Regions:
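Glycine-rich phosphate/diphosphate-binding loop of Rossmann-like nucleotide-binding domains
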Residues: 19-105, 109, 121-123, 127-128, ...
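Rossmann-fold NAD(P)-binding glycine/threonine-rich loop
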Residues: 1-14, 111-160
């Protein structure tokens, strides 16, 4: 089973909005936002990361929900300025504590997908201090990773 939609046919179906499923971690992001009643329609969502496993697929899923999506990465010019415009940030850049409090506006929703091991401890891509400014914040560990694991189990149990 292709739980991360890496097969070119499945990736193409996802791109065209016709896929019966999506990669597990992007699905986990969407399920978490839905569970907590986070409105996406018309919201400016910045996806920080452009991987084929998280960044691009989650951007496609957000577009299907009528969000306005900007995809950024560690080399985006004036990244703090772009992030400060976001209503929602999905961080999947793979750099520990990369997003700092001065890079986001008050009330932002943070979905931290990053999982980075530093000296035996796990850190997300968003500095934990950002939680004080956020209206919603997924922690690392204990956030999207847990939901992503549930999505893997869901995919493996399906008769596709």
């Amino acid at each position: 089973k292709d739980v991360d939609c890496l097969n070119p046919l499945n990736a193409g179906e996802l791109y065209l909005g016709r896929s019966r499923w999506a990669p597990c971690t992007p699905r986990a992001c969407m399920a978490t936002l839905s569970h907590y009643g986070i409105e996406l329609k018309g919201k400016h969502v910045v996806v920080l990361g452009r991987s084929n496993v998280v960044g691009k697929p989650v951007a496609l899923l957000l577009l299907q929900e009528h969000a306005t999506v900007t995809i950024c990465h560690s080399r985006t010019q004036d990244l703090p300025g772009v992030l400060r415009q976001a209503d929602i940030i999905v961080a999947a850049v793979g750099i520990p504590s990369f997003v700092k409090p001065d890079m986001v506006k008050d009330g932002v929703v943070i979905v931290d997908v990053g999982i980075n091991a530093v000296d035996g401890k796990l850190f997300g891509d968003v500095d934990a201090a950002v939680a004080e400014k956020a209206s919603a914040f997924t922690p690392v560990p204990g956030g999207i990773g847990v939901v992503s694991n549930m999505m893997v189990m869901d995919m493996l149990s399906r008769d596709l």
